UniProtKB/Swiss-Prot annotation:
<feature type="modified residue" description="Phosphotyrosine">
    <location>
        <position position="132"/>
    </location>
</feature>
<dbReference type="GO" id="GO:0003993">
    <property type="term" value="F:acid phosphatase activity"/>
</dbReference>
<feature type="active site">
    <location>
        <position position="19"/>
    </location>
</feature>
<keyword id="KW-0904">Protein phosphatase</keyword>
<comment type="function">
    <text>Acts on tyrosine phosphorylated proteins, low-MW aryl phosphates and natural and synthetic acyl phosphates.</text>
</comment>
<feature type="active site" description="Proton donor">
    <location>
        <position position="130"/>
    </location>
</feature>
<feature type="modified residue" description="N-acetylalanine">
    <location>
        <position position="2"/>
    </location>
</feature>
<dbReference type="GO" id="GO:0004725">
    <property type="term" value="F:protein tyrosine phosphatase activity"/>
</dbReference>
<comment type="similarity">
    <text>Belongs to the low molecular weight phosphotyrosine protein phosphatase family.</text>
</comment>
<dbReference type="GO" id="GO:0004726">
    <property type="term" value="F:non-membrane spanning protein tyrosine phosphatase activity"/>
</dbReference>
<dbReference type="InterPro" id="IPR036196">
    <property type="entry name" value="Ptyr_pPase_sf"/>
</dbReference>
<dbReference type="InterPro" id="IPR017867">
    <property type="entry name" value="Tyr_phospatase_low_mol_wt"/>
</dbReference>
<feature type="active site" description="Nucleophile">
    <location>
        <position position="13"/>
    </location>
</feature>
<keyword id="KW-0007">Acetylation</keyword>
<dbReference type="InterPro" id="IPR050438">
    <property type="entry name" value="LMW_PTPase"/>
</dbReference>
<keyword id="KW-0597">Phosphoprotein</keyword>
<feature type="modified residue" description="Phosphotyrosine">
    <location>
        <position position="133"/>
    </location>
</feature>
Length: 158
């Protein structure tokens, strides 16, 4: 990455209240710890409209607090602008990927590279499963996957 150049990443899941806000918060902490937060624009969004305006799921917030990470995101839906302004759009599962690819085809000048966040997992867990209908342990699994994937993503040359 050239000196002074700001890169951008948008984390996406179905509702933007479980997986993507966890990934966003984890990545924010990583770039802050590495003292490169001024080199990144970071956000998260949903493919659906189900949860727009809502805070992250309380179980995800509890999990993140346990790890000393605060979340202050409010759910929003992916916009056409996102495809033109973010360098990377990283999503959680095949359904997100399909929805994003379909939406990106309707956008002129899509500059975003759309990928699964799990593609960066050193443990090769490609899919980050939705913990919404699960329990605290499922949120912890999402957190652990996001830490592994976000670290690997941050370490790659951009």
């Amino acid at each position: 990455m050239a000196a002074g150049e700001v890169k951008s990443v948008l984390f996406v899941c179905l509702g933007n209240i479980c997986r993507s806000p966890i990934a966003e918060a984890v990545f924010r902490k990583l770039v802050t710890d590495e003292k490169v937060e001024n080199k990144w624009r970071i956000d998260s969004a949903a493919t659906s409209t189900y949860e727009i305006g809502n805070p992250p799921d309380y179980r995800g917030q509890t999990c993140m607090k346990k790890h000393g990470i605060t979340m202050n995101h409010i759910a929003r839906q992916v916009t056409k602008d996102d495809f033109q302004t973010f360098d990377y759009i990283l999503c959680m599962d095949e359904s997100n990927l399909r929805d994003l690819k379909r939406k990106s085809n309707q956008v002129k000048d899509c500059k975003a590279k759309i990928e699964l966040l799990g593609a960066y997992d050193p443990q090769k867990q490609l899919i980050i499963e939705d913990p919404y209908y699960g329990n605290e342990k499922d949120f912890e699994t999402v957190y652990e996957q996001c830490v592994r994937c976000c670290k690997a993503f941050l370490e790659k040359p951009h």
